[in-house]
């Protein structure tokens, strides 16, 4: 198979597989249903906010409808209201809607982040985003001058979220050279406006025409392009949706392919409409001739958490210590994970189902102890999963409707009748979290999680990997305030021989420490357990349960901040250590790690991507050491270092999202994912997320031919807080299912990953310096075999006819290991490279079996040689009005006459006579 066919094959596989998304959105007869807009629990109660959300969506719907050629509109929206707000008659309990699967989050503005609407987008072009972020101030219309009408801004963000398009402006590079002329970064180029700069000194500001930087040929820093208020151009929404005439997305006919913006960089110069047209939404709809109705809204208020454990006690649970491991994990969940004031019930099943506990509200430690005593202790019989689910629904209905309740379903066995209760599950409104234990658990299990928005996890029989405890530890509430959720600090295991020691440390940072629990498990005999706090004081008092083979220590109050040390000693058995805690304060956001795969199914040879999002509130944590442990059904564990370098699988550098490709499949079936994150000497906190996908801040507008300026956009410059952040966390990334994996030896079908951060600079007037992050032999792993670099004076020829473009001599360029920085200096040959020339450059990496990567992002250099004589004044629309010659004669005692002549904008001639 040739490299081009291989790339197409991988692309097709990617399109066939559904991306992993928590969203409940469905497209039905051109209308989007199931949109969830959640109001953050920390937002003060304000009923007008609900009406403002309704107004925004209602205004956005017809704008979206017209912008997409009468194809899409907003049909119904659920607004999720915090539990702490007063209850009202028209507020109902949610079903599957949670904060976890919310498409839009309304949260208070941050001191550094401001009120800028933005969308989390960790994937590639065309991949759906994570969620839209809005603030109450924005919704209240207090940012109209800065971001434009709320409805239009929402459509801009919706395009990021739903179709994976990017912005067509550039806050860092607002102008570029094209054929020797300065152009504003915009789409389309038909948008006209003024180019001026607003200078402020002391308490006063004034507007002046922009001056040129004679070294670059571009405008000075601070220069802004302000669109005229009266326009005829209709595109583009991803550039300036606030302009009245803009009602469309850029198409291939009017798209500005040369503009250095994220849409061109990420989407291979394609217009936003081309990306939208390739979406599944577009493919399964046709334009409608009827005007859509206004959106409808449902008001949902979060209530108390209701959970029923549905636990397998069939005969197979007696093998491999599974039933005892279930007891250990179940005790952790009941003693530590489940939050106060929650309701918990318990059902077990074999060939039939049995109630172990009706719903009990967790108000004290004794309530927790009561439930732990109901965990199953004997295993026998067959496996009837539907019996367990039906009985769980009955248990819940005795006190509450099943809407919004949660079921934790654990099983290790096969059950070919499980699909018989799928309809009952769908109609219940309950969320089902599944835990598949061992290699024989029912293959239909994941369907229950998918159809209800629950978490799917897998635990192998490899006890030292602590998978079952990790699965139950991941079941903290998806709703409520983050300060009440359990946070896992450590999860570790080891098989010890001959009185060996398992030594280690756990960091308790200042953001956690409440309800801290150390849990130790073993497989045969109680080990020696030694634990010291950061001051060196030995901690005694572990509660030992020899029957369940576990011991735990609850630290009273707030655990001391610092490094806790432990030593565990045993012979011929496997030990595990788990440490959990909660936020130390309701007002100090804890550091959290959220991990996931990009898909819940993987088909060889399509790669998977593992993500870990590390935050303290809205602030990303940078430079942490992050590793993913991915375990297959064979028991083989692969360790991946996750990176936040903006290369390979990672979409953006220094945004707190760490990513890596996974390609080392070894078998078909389930894989579990666990992420470990450590913050030490290098880890730091960033005040805000660098904007990737958001509405453009409007620098000003034109009124009566004069620019009215907004305050300068709040800059996030040098915002990394230098104080190091020390912490330790572990996080379950759930599980995924692989198929199509051939028997060993597994063939090499993985090419190098695409280079996405190619940059080019001119050195002198003839040399070009390239920098990029090295790809690997298999995506972002290993070392590529060679690079192919090609250049062209036509950006489209380079994209569409790469193999026909002029090749650069790279004989001396030896690829480095993946994720290293590459630097290459060359002189363009056999091509005209003179003043005013625009040169475009792209790279392709090749591996040892001649598989080729996708062509890189296209870098651009424009050769500008400063003129010896003043250039002509550019046109007013594209730059500014001509500046008249000014001559000032001044005679001052003791000083010669000073003459100033402005020869051309940007050149100041001084002569002293």
UniProtKB/Swiss-Prot annotation:
Domain VWFA: 306-475
GO CC, any one term: plasma membrane
Glycosylated sites: 503, 769, 803, 809, 830, 835, 885, 889
Binding site for Zn(2+): 156, 160, 167
Top-level taxonomic group: Eukaryota
Record bears the keyword Protease: yes
SUPFAM superfamilies referenced in this protein's UniProt entry, alphabetically: vWA-like
Secretion signal, residue range per the UniProt entry: 1-21
Disordered: region residues: 866-885
Cell compartments where the protein resides: Secreted, Extracellular space
EC number(s) on file: 3.4.-.-
GO molecular function: intracellularly calcium-gated chloride channel activity; metal ion binding; metallopeptidase activity
PTM comment text: Glycosylated.
GO biological process: calcium ion transport; proteolysis
Entry keywords, A to Z: Autocatalytic cleavage, Calcium, Calcium transport, Chloride, Glycoprotein, Hydrolase, Ion transport, Metal-binding, Metalloprotease, Protease, Secreted, Signal, Transport, Zinc
Role according to the record: May be involved in mediating calcium-activated chloride conductance. May play critical roles in goblet cell metaplasia, mucus hypersecretion, cystic fibrosis and AHR. May be involved in the regulation of mucus production and/or secretion by goblet cells. Involved in the regulation of tissue inflammation in the innate immune response. May play a role as a tumor suppressor. Induces MUC5AC.
Comment block on domains: The metalloprotease region is responsible for autoproteolytic processing. It can also cross-cleave other CLCA substrates.
Family stated for the protein in its record: Belongs to the CLCR family.
Protein name in UniProt: Calcium-activated chloride channel regulator 1
Species for this entry: Macaca mulatta
């Amino acid at each position: 198979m040739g490299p081009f066919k291989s790339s197409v094959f991988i692309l097709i596989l990617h399109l066939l597989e559904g991306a992993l998304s928590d969203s409940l959105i469905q497209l039905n007869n051109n209308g989007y249903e199931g949109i969830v807009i959640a109001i953050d629990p920390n937002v003060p109660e304000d009923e007008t906010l609900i009406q403002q959300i309704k107004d925004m969506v209602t205004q956005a719907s017809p704008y979206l409808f017209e912008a997409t050629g009468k194809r899409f509109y907003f049909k119904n929206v659920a607004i999720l209201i915090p539990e702490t707000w007063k209850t009202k008659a028209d507020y109902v309990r949610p079903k599957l809607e949670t904060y976890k699967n919310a498409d839009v989050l309304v949260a208070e503005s941050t001191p550094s982040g401001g009120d800028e609407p933005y969308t989390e987008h960790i994937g590639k072009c065309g991949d759906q985003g994570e969620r839209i972020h809005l603030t109450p101030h924005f919704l209240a219309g207090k940012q109209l001058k800065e971001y434009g009408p709320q409805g239009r801004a929402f459509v801009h963000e919706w395009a990021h979220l739903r179709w994976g398009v990017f912005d067509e402006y550039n806050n860092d590079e607002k102008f570029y050279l094209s054929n020797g002329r300065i152009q504003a970064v915009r789409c389309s180029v038909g948008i006209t406006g003024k180019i001026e700069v607003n200078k402020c000194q002391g308490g006063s500001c004034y507007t002046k025409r922009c001056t040129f930087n004679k070294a670059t040929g571009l405008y000075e820093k601070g220069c802004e392009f302000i669109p005229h208020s009266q326009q005829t151009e209709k595109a583009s929404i991803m550039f300036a949706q606030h302009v009245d005439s803009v009602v469309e997305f850029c198409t291939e006919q009017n798209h500005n392919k040369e503009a250095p913006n994220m849409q061109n960089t990420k989407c291979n110069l394609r217009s936003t409409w081309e990306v939208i047209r390739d979406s599944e939404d577009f493919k399964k709809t046709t334009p409608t001739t009827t005007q859509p109705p206004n959106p409808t809204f449902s008001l949902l208020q979060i209530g108390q958490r209701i959970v029923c454990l549905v636990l397998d006690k069939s005969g197979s649970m007696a093998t491999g210590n599974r039933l005892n491991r279930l007891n250990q994990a179940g005790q952790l969940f009941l003693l530590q994970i489940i939050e106060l004031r929650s309701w918990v019930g318990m059902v077990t099943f074999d060939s039939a189902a049995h109630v172990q506990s009706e719903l009990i509200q967790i108000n004290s430690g004794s309530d927790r102890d009561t439930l732990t005593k109901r965990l199953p202790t004997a295993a026998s019989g067959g496996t009837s999963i539907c019996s367990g689910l039906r009985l769980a629904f009955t248990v819940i209905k005795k006190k509450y409707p099943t809407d919004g309740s949660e079921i934790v379903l654990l099983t290790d066995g096969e059950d070919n009748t499980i699909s018989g209760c799928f309809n009952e599950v769908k109609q219940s409104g309950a969320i089902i979290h599944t835990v598949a234990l061992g290699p024989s658990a029912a293959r239909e299990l994941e369907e229950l999680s998918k159809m209800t928005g629950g978490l799917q996890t897998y635990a192998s029989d490899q006890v030292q990997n602590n998978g079952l405890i990790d699965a139950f530890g991941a079941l903290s509430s998806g709703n409520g305030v983050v300060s009440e959720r359990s946070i896992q600090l450590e999860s570790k295991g080891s098989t010890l021989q001959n009185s060996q020691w398992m030594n280690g440390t756990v960091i308790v940072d200042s953001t956690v420490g409440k309800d801290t629990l150390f849990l130790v498990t073993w497989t045969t005999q109680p080990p020696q357990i030694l634990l010291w706090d950061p001051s060196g004081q030995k901690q005694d008092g572990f509660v030992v349960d020899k029957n369940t083979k576990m011991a735990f220590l609850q630290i009273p109050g707030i655990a001391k901040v610092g490094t806790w040390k432990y030593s565990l000693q045993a012979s011929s058995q496997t030990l595990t250590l788990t440490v959990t805690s909660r936020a130390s304060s309701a007002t100090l956001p804890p550091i959290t790690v959220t991990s996931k795969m990009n898909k819940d199914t993987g088909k060889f040879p399509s790669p998977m991507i593992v993500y870990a999002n590390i935050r303290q509130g809205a602030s990303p944590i940078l430079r942490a050491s992050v590793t993913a442990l991915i375990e297959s059904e064979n028991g083989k564990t692969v360790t991946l270092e996750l990176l936040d370098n903006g290369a390979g699988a990672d979409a953006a550098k220094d945004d707190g999202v760490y990513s890596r490709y996974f390609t080392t499949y070894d078998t078909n079936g389930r894989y579990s994912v666990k992420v470990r994150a450590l913050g030490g000497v290098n880890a730091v906190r960033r005040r805000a997320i660098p904007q990737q996908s958001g509405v453009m801040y409007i620098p000003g507008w034109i009124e009566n031919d004069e620019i009215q300026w907004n305050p300068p956009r709040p800059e996030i410059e040098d915002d990394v807080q230098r104080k190091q952040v020390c912490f330790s966390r572990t996080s379950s990334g759930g599980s995924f299912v692989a198929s199509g994996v051939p028997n060993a030896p597994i063939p090499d079908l993985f090419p190098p990953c695409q280079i996405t951060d190619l940059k080019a600079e001119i050195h002198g007037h003839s040399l070009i310096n390239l920098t990029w992050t090295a790809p690997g032999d298999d995506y972002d792993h290993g070392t590529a075999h060679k690079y192919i670099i090609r250049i062209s004076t036509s950006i489209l020829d380079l994209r569409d006819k790469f193999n026909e473009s002029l090749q650069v001599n790279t004989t001396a360029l030896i690829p480095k290991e993946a994720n290293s920085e590459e630097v290459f200096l060359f002189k363009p040959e056999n091509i005209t490279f003179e003043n005013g020339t625009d040169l475009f450059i792209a790279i392709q990496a090749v591996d040892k079996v001649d598989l080729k990567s996708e062509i890189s992002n296209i870098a651009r250099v424009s050769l500008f040689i400063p003129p010896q004589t003043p250039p002509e004044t550019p046109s007013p629309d594209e730059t500014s009005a001509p500046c008249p010659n000014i001559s000032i004669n001044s005679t001052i005692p003791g000083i010669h006459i000073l003459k100033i002549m402005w020869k051309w904008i940007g050149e100041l001639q001084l002569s002293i006579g």
